[in-house]
Amino acid sequence: MKLAELVGDDLPVDRVHGFLREIVAPLTLADAERVPLFEALGRVLAQDIVSPVSVPPHDNSAMDGYAFDGALLDADAAPDAALSLRIAGTALAGTCWQGSLAPGDAVRIMTGAVMPAGLDTVVPQEFCTVDGDSVRFPMRALRPGANRRRAGEDLLQGEAALRRGERLSPAALGLVASLGLPTVPVWRRLRVAYFSTGEEILNMGDAPREGAVYDSNRYTVFGLLQRLGCEVIDLGLVRDDPATLE
């Protein structure tokens, strides 16, 4: 279509929108690419991100404290009643405690450490008094299951962590990294060419002249396109002439 045929006597905005919809081809999966996480900020997902693991992957402690069996708590205990337990060992983050437990035992546990089998509650260390190999704390300080993060509490294996069409934020990058995924499928950047036109427009560095203004809109459009993550092609300042514009 020739420019003159497009313009006619006038050019309403809705006509421009219709023309653009006719000539712009929508992206397909052939236009998707995989990029490393360090290059993915601001890009748009071409496919859902499905979690290959549960997050967290195991029951773990939300506090530094002592893990124990919550069934030992008595909801009807007197306000000043305390529970005293033997400390059977220490569970560190990044390892699985392999010790053995007797009824009434507790395990010193760090934030993020895997909950020892058979223990489901963590009392924060601030509530505890330690005497040798025993720990004592008020029963009313917590309820069974307190301060325990369950496996899959944030995200279950096979669940969609992020949806196609989402723009990747810093938080989204962290979420993908927590799944152990080094790359993400994103749409290629939209390629957008633009220019300024008008005999009254001056380029940066031109000497001022009466009736003319410096080209500011081009830089505004450049900033908007860059912020949207587009691949920007600046065609510069084009003469206000139909043949040149063609």
PLM regions: where:
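A generic alpha-helix structural signal
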Residues: H17-R21, L41, A88, Q125, ...
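Noncatalytic alpha-helical scaffolds and linker/capping helices
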Residues: D241-L245
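Short, glycine/charged-enriched hinge/interface segments at domain edges or termini
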Residues: K2-G8, A67-D234, R239
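Short, low-complexity N-terminal leaders and the immediately following helix N-cap/first helix
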Residues: M1-A78
